[in-house]
Every structure is written in structure tokens, then in C-alpha cells.
Amino acid sequence: QKQLIAWAKNRVSHGGAGIKIRLVKGANLAMEKVDAELHGWPQAPYPTKEEVDANYKRMLHEGCRPENAKFVRLGVASHNLFDLAYAQLLRTREGVENRVEFEMLEGMANHQARVVNEAAGGLLLYAPVVNRGDFHNAIAYLVRRLDENTVPENFLHDLFGMTPGDAAWEAQRQRFLRACSLRDRVSADPRRTQNRATESIKLLPPDAPFRNEPDTDWALPHNVAWIREKVAAMRAVPMAEVPAAGEAEVESALQTVANAQAAWRALGFTGRATLLRQVAAGLARHRGGLIATMVSDAGKAVGEADSEVSEAIDFANFYARGFADPAFFDGSNFEPLGTVAVVPPWNFPLAIP
């Protein structure tokens, strides 16, 4: 918010127009949780509603400061009457009524919207607009908003059965007061801080539970700078020159593999599991170079190559963990298969052996 305000001030100083910031909370939280879980990242929004509410009020105060409101109009989007009343009093106290407006959704609590419109002297009402044949999309939109706003902690959950002074009202009042008390203490630091350039990769212990390897968070500028450097360096590397092998070279390679079988057998399951964990750690340490190589050699996009590195690490850790699982050996007899050729497909050169 502060960065946007500073940008808006600079824009106006150069003859441009101001901007508007809409303060809204709770929207698309389910999607944020799914996205974080799929990629192995911390959830970007605050983990608790109390923290979200506290930060909302902090942003409201920042937006209502006259020196900021002059350049940035503020939209207070909420159905929580406590928040709306708070914003109404705050904008009046700061003398910025004409720079702060209230916003609500059509179909959520229309009787409440009418009262807010009268008390605030105006209201921006949002409604989905679709062709008649696409009406189901409008219903889906409202159902999603209803789902987001009617979880037990939310104001709308209690709105229709709540009266001032009853238990539900008091619970909402206490939530509001706790958020106010945390306004200046809630963290403003980003929750996603992954840094591929400085991360430390450690070998997992044998008893570590299996967890999917996190993908690279490309929303973080330092990660983008990291991979740009890796890809640029790879462009200066000439493609490998591979001599054509003849029958003698093939026989030599096969003999080398055959000679190594005794050492591989001597490792046992514990040794092989350790080796696989070392492979996983090595892949993680060389993620940038592997991505750049796949981009250069196989024409993969950076995002796809990054996910493939994560998948390769997962394979190594998963099978290493499997050696410690009693079910892996249940009723099985293991016999050496001999020499096996591993030829990965062109489109998954790393993760699929």
C-alpha cells in the first residue's frame, strides 16, 4: 500500500491522475491455500482472521491520512458493520469523506446495503453482469462470495440471527476490539521469503517424513534475478560435442556397468537409500543449472523445468524413504535384473528415467 501511495504521488507530481485502492479481505482465500499447498509454499495471506482484520484496520488508517487520500482514493469493501462504522468515523475525523467510499456486493445483504447507503451518503454496489444464457456464471460468483463470507468467524455468518447485545453480537464485538488492539503490532513482513540464491541444502536424515519439494516462487523478484543469471550463463556455453560411439565403446560401457554391479549389491538397501538422498540434495543444489540446461538443450520453459527438478527430487526422496518401509519388502524376493538401459523422453529429460 505504501509503495502504491508513493507511486501515485509521483505520478500526480508529473501531471498524471491519482489512483484508487480497494481494501477487501477474505476473497479467494481458498484459492490461495490450494496454490500454496500445491507448490509447497507458505500461505501468502495471514494465517488467522484476527491478523487479517488487524491489518485491514492499519491499511484503513494509512489510506485515510489526508496527505495520502489526496492522491489515492480508498474503497472500503466490507459487509462487516463494525468495520464500516469504524471507517465512517475515521474518514469524518480525518476530513476525507469525499476520498473514501464504501463498497458492497449485490445480493449479499441488501437491507444492510440500503442503510449504509443512507448513513454514508453513497455506496458502490457490485453485481455480476452476464448475458441471459450465462446466468449460471453469475450464480456461481455469488455462491463463491457467500461461501467466503459466511464461515463461522465472519460477520455475515451471524448477521441474520444477531441482535445488538446478544451472544453473537458480543462475539463479533470482541473480535473487532482484538483486531483494533493488534493494529499496530501485526506483522507487515512477507510470509513467502524463499531465496534460491542463498538457500542452504541439507541431506535429509533417514527417518525424515516424505514431503514434496517446494517449487521456486517466481513472485519473488530475487528468484527471477537468480534464474535470469543462470540462463544467461548457459547461453555462453557451447552445446556438447558427442563423438559417435562404435561397437567397441558400447561393449566397454556395458562391461563397466557389469563390473559395478558387485559394488552396488554391497551397498544394500541402507546404502542405496543414502545414495538416493544424496542425489536428491545434489539435484536441489544444482536446481538453477539444471533449469538452464533444460531451457537451452530441450527448449523447456523455465517454470516447467523448475517443476521437473522438484519432481526429480521427489522421486529420489520417495524411493529412499521406501527402503525404510516394511511394506516395501512384504512377501517380496529380490533378484538382480542385470544391465538396464535408461532412456528418458525428450520432453522430461530429468524427472522421468
PLM regions and their residue ranges:
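Conserved short loop/turn motifs at secondary-structure junctions
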Residues: 1, 78-79, 102-105, 276-281, ...
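Positively charged, amphipathic and often flexible ligand-engagement surfaces
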Residues: 1-205
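Charged, low-complexity surface patches
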Residues: 105-106, 135, 283, 305, ...
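Terminal low-complexity tails and localization/encapsulation signals of metabolic enzymes
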Residues: 121, 132-281, 285, 292-293, ...
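Conserved coil-to-alpha-helix start sites within the AMP-binding
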Residues: 345-353
